[in-house]
UniProtKB/Swiss-Prot annotation:
It comes from the Eukaryota. GO terms for biological process: mitochondrial FAD transmembrane transport; transmembrane transport. Its main location: mitochondrion. The lineage of its organism: Eukaryota, Fungi, Dikarya, Ascomycota, Taphrinomycotina. It comes from Schizosaccharomyces pombe (strain 972 / ATCC 24843) (Fission yeast). It is found in: Mitochondrion inner membrane. This is Uncharacterized mitochondrial carrier C27B12.09c. The chain crosses the membrane at residues 3-24, 60-80, 102-122, 152-172, 190-210, 240-261. Solcar repeats lie at residues 1-84, 96-179, 184-268.
Amino acid sequence: MDQAIAGLAAGTASTLIMHPLDLAKIQMQASMNQDSKSLFQVFKSNIGSNGSIRSLYHGLSINVLGSAASWGAYFCIYDFSKRVVMSMTPFNNGEISVLQTLCSSGFAGCIVAALTNPIWVVKSRILSKRVNYTNPFFGFYDLIKNEGLRGCYAGFAPSLLGVSQGALQFMAYEKLKLWKQRRPTSLDYIFMSAASKVFAAVNMYPLLVIRTRLQVMRSPHRSIMNLVLQTWRLQGILGFYKGFLPHLLRVVPQTCITFLVYEQVGMHFKTQSSKSQ
């Protein structure tokens, strides 16, 4: 429960701060136009739609819901699976191996992806402004009514493949934590989380673009391979990295905030637990 609360708090805090960049990233990913807008142009377009900076927080509620739920569940499942796999190898000196980290984070990622995919479908559609959902609840209702279970799991295959991004990130993060011989400081946590996220993002970002486009499209005949070929034909290799700048500007600070809050909240619970014993 402590891990879930820490993860939920971390996910909520980071999403509240970084939402405008997520909005820009989704809109850039969803665009199939050959002429790409810059990050500044996307912000300007959103603000110009109603003349208020509040437009940059369009869809905030569904984003907070998804991030809080996914991070809370992820850290809880990851911590549980990590303890299980480590207990199966008693001669590990208390250190988790690369394979154990990949297995634990991969398992947690698959479970969370299955649980939260409908939230991300509604989020992608609200933030891309391709549909006129008045609120997230109407979005879920419309999605289930018109597209059923298949619509709820649009983009699920790339999400599962994208689990490897989280696995790569946690593998790098755990190894960096072991590299620090002393107790890590807040600055150490920021550096380790940023480095691990950049490492994973560069390798796996094209899957996020394909996932967003599958979720935004409402055609029942959407195909991953057709979308990959269409993106390559119309936009080339750069098409698979549309929105990468706002993605990095968002996820690196967001990951730093998430992991720092998670580690600090987790440390608080450990301290309180030791005092009560």
